[in-house]
Design a protein with these regions (language model features):
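Beta1-alpha1 glycine-rich phosphate/pyrophosphate-binding loop at the start
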Residues: 2-67, 72, 79
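Short hydrophobic core segments
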Residues: 5-7, 106-112
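Domain-scale terminal segments
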Residues: 77, 82-83, 110-112
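Glycine-centered tight beta-turn/hairpin loop motif at sheet-sheet or coil-to-beta transitions
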Residues: 101-105
């Protein structure tokens, strides 16, 4: 069973994964199993083009930023499992015992 399953790898999902990943050495987060369903197709950034964002080169595509964010996550926090090529179809259960069904598998998580 996962302790936390993050659904979606848009800006909010990846930010959540980065924050939880960075806490791996904290007493409250040690030995926690964290995963992210790395589906990004619904993110509004998919079609964005950045021209005036601080620190981002002009003409940078949002889809590139999303892809790079997952690469960054896997590089610095490899303990955060990235579930790729799957889309969530349903969620059932209650706090502490959720069942998340994707197009390929079913996952159990305490928190989603």
């Amino acid at each position: 069973m996962l302790d936390v399953l993050i659904i979606g790898a848009g800006v909010s999902g990846v930010s959540c994964a980065l924050i939880l990943g960075s806490a791996q050495n904290k007493p409250f987060a040690m030995d926690k199993k964290i995963a992210i369903v790395a589906h990004q197709k619904a993110s509004s950034l998919q079609n964005a083009i950045f021209n005036n964002a601080y620190g981002i080169p002009a003409g940078k595509l949002g889809s590139e930023l999303l892809e790079e964010s997952l690469e960054h996550l896997s590089k610095i926090y490899p303990h955060v499992l990235q579930i790729e090529g799957e889309k969530v179809l349903s969620i059932s259960g209650e706090a502490g015992n959720f069942s998340i069904t994707t197009n390929k598998s079913t996952y159990q998580a305490k928190i989603i």
